[in-house]
A protein has these predicted regions:
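N-terminal helical capping/dimerization or prosegment-like subdomains
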Residues: 2-95
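Short coil-to-beta-strand
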Residues: 15-18, 101, 198-201
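Beta-strand secondary-structure signal
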Residues: 20, 69, 145, 199-203
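Fold-independent oxyanion-binding glycine-rich loops
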Residues: 63, 85-87, 109, 117, ...
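Active-site metal-coordination/substrate-binding segment of hydrolases
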Residues: 78-148
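Short glycine-aspartate micro-motif
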Residues: 80-82, 173-177, 199-201
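Acidic/histidine-rich catalytic neighborhood of metal-dependent amide-processing enzymes
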Residues: 118-193
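Flexible glycine/proline-rich, aromatic-decorated loop/lid segments
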Residues: 189-205
């Protein structure tokens, strides 16, 4: 067992509970009735980022749902990594197709089943925990910034204006996106570019 595996094993109960606390919040950006849940999820993320060791974690207003910004500056002259993720999720309907409650995580066959466990709370949580491990073990060599938005599932309508307004705050040398695909369960992939959204309407007759 390597040092990372030992760290996970020693902290697994708390790690799982922290992740589950995020998943339990129904942060559905497409439904206005979940407005309060969006804020609750952003605030929970800010709390977890502070616990991970960032210098500051802010829940910042945007034209829509709040955006979480956090940073850890280890050396003003070092390179800076900006981690992008989103905390909003899609609606869970049709509920009758779920074997368990979508916002009550359940572990089955070694997998976490819940809305947001994969897209995108799970991936972003892993990156925050990786940051925490590096920081606690004196291995963090770069500055790290985090930006977590709450509107990715509806096309990120507020993100561009937010980034334009906060250029200096978000300045970085490289961006790490935690919301891309894998070619297979045992075959990680590296996505080097994203081109936005495209929509088609297909009508089939006959």
């Amino acid at each position: 067992m390597n040092e990372i595996q030992k760290y996970i094993a020693a902290n697994e109960p708390q790690i799982m509970e922290d992740l589950f606390s995020l998943i339990r919040i129904p942060s559905i950006s497409a439904l206005p009735e979940h407005h309060d849940d969006m804020l609750a999820c952003a605030e929970r993320w800010a709390q977890l980022l502070l616990e991970a060791g960032v210098d500051e974690a802010l829940v910042m207003p945007s034209q829509g749902n709040p955006i979480v910004f956090a940073q850890k500056i280890v050396d003003p002259d070092a390179k800076t990594v900006l981690v992008y993720a989103h905390y909003d999720v899609m609606p869970a309907e049709p509920l009758e197709l779920w074997k368990s409650q979508p916002f009550e995580p359940e572990i089955r066959d070694g997998y976490i089943w819940a809305r947001g466990a994969d897209d995108d709370k799970g991936q972003s949580f892993i990156q925050v925990k990786a940051f925490e491990y590096l920081l606690k073990n004196g291995l963090l060599r770069n500055n790290v910034k985090f930006i977590f938005e709450g509107e990715e599932e509806i096309g990120s309508p507020s993100l561009e204006a937010f980034c334009e307004e906060h250029k200096e705050l978000l300045k970085a040398d490289v961006i790490l996106v935690s919301d891309t695909s894998m070619l297979g369960a045992d075959l990680p992939s590296l996505t080097t570019g994203l081109r936005g959204l495209a929509y088609w309407e297909i009508e089939v007759t006959g």
